[in-house]
Every structure is written in structure tokens, then in C-alpha cells.
From Swiss-Prot:
UniProt function note: Specifically methylates the N7 position of a guanine in 16S rRNA.
Binding-site positions, S-adenosyl-L-methionine: 86, 91, 178
A molecular function (GO) term: rRNA (guanine-N7-)-methyltransferase activity
Record-linked HAMAP family: 16SrRNA_methyltr_G
Top-level division of the source organism's lineage: Bacteria
Coiled coil: none
Family: Belongs to the methyltransferase superfamily. RNA methyltransferase RsmG family.
Subcellular location: Cytoplasm
Gene Ontology CC, one term: cytosol
Name of the protein described by the UniProt record: Ribosomal RNA small subunit methyltransferase G
InterPro entries, alphabetized: rRNA_ssu_MeTfrase_G, SAM-dependent_MTases_sf
Keyword tags: Cytoplasm, Methyltransferase, rRNA processing, S-adenosyl-L-methionine, Transferase
Amino acid sequence: MRMVCMSDVNDELDGSPILEEVLGDALGKLKVFHVKLAAEGEPRGLIGPRDVGIIWERHILNSAAIVPFIREATAKRQFKTVADIGSGGGFPGIVAAACLPDHQFTLVEPMERRIEWLHECVDEMGLDNVSIVRSRANAVIEAVRGSNGGRKGRGEDAVDLDGNPIPVRHPFAVVTCRAVAPMTKLSGWTLPLLDKGGRLVALKGRSAQEEIVKATKEISKNGGIHPRVVEAEVGPGLEPTHVLMVDER
């Protein structure tokens, strides 16, 4: 009996016009990403076995739902910089970077095997607007705030999990993430990375508004204002997702 390769499993949206409608010019690069995810994502622990036939909707289109919100947040900025915290399998960072080639993305992920995956994806997709840092968020915050917050020299001392200096010295216009942590923790991992007037854009589940209520103190403590949740379209006829946003005062 022949073993079924995960790449042999058809995706429900393969060939759908929804893909081109939502992803536009990024579709070619994201097809490369989809093929790689279908073949390697489950055995490498990046997606669940039940996700293989719904990668387009659950992971790629869901991640792409934040793209309009990133564009809105950077519309008036000269430097369109985005940090993606806890990038994991590339959601939403790899997808958003493919959709926004005029933005510079920094993917932050602590796990070595996921870092290896992200580097492979960037190389195979030909993404030249992505840098990858193997680090936890607090070390990147130290690199940014130590260089820009008046603590002379401390930012230069910040190192990644391989002991290398973290090549980040400026706060970001936008910070993104998906399924990383509740807002009580996420506030302290993301908001300190934002430039003045920057914006956190996080993909969340149905409990997003409850998370805001529980994290009111943490959001304010870390300089966040105007926390809100909006329903974001994933694609025509598909279930929408939720985007949680917080501005940096």
C-alpha cells in the first residue's frame, strides 16, 4: 500500500479565484509557501494534520487578513517597518511580507527549528524584505529601547539566543503576531517595540474583546491607547477573523 504524502492532499481552495482576488501579485510566492507547508508543515510540527487540506484558508488567507491594517498604519510613514513576534511557521509574518514588498519585516522567533524553517521559506520564496532574529521579545525590546531610550550602551549589549548582537536599533511602525499569548502578557512583549504613534496588529480569536478587558492595566502601563477589535474579512464566503489593535501613545 502506497503511503499518502501530505503534498498529495488537495486543498479545498486550490484553483479558487478567491486566492488571486485576495492575494493579488503575492499569489505566486505564496503558492511556493503553500506547497512547502503541505509537504513539510505537519511532519515538522508547524501545522496540525487536520490543517493540510485547508492551509489556504486557515493559515495563508487568515494571515493575509491583517495586510490592509498594516497598510493603514504605515500609510503616512517614510519607514514602513514591521516586527512579527513569535513567527513560528510564518504566520502572519511570511504571508504579510509577501503581500507587502515595500515594507521591511523582522521576524522574531526563539525556537531553532522554526528559525531554520523561516530561513528556508524566505530563500525559496525570494523574499528580500525579511530579516530573521532568533530571540525572545524581551531581548529585542532591550536592543530597541536600550539604544533609543536614553540607556547608553545597553541596546548594543542585547544578544540573540545564539549569542550574536541583535541587529535592531529602532522601534517599529507596526508589530504583528498570531496566537502567541493573551493580551495580559502580549502587551509587554509587543507595545514597547513600537515607535511613537505605532500600532499593534494582532490576529485573535473570538475572545479578543475579553482579552482587552482583562489586560486594561497592562496595555496602559506599556503605553497603549485605543485598544479595539475589528472583524476582518478573510475572503468572499469564508469565515472572518478578528484583529486586535492598540496604538502607542
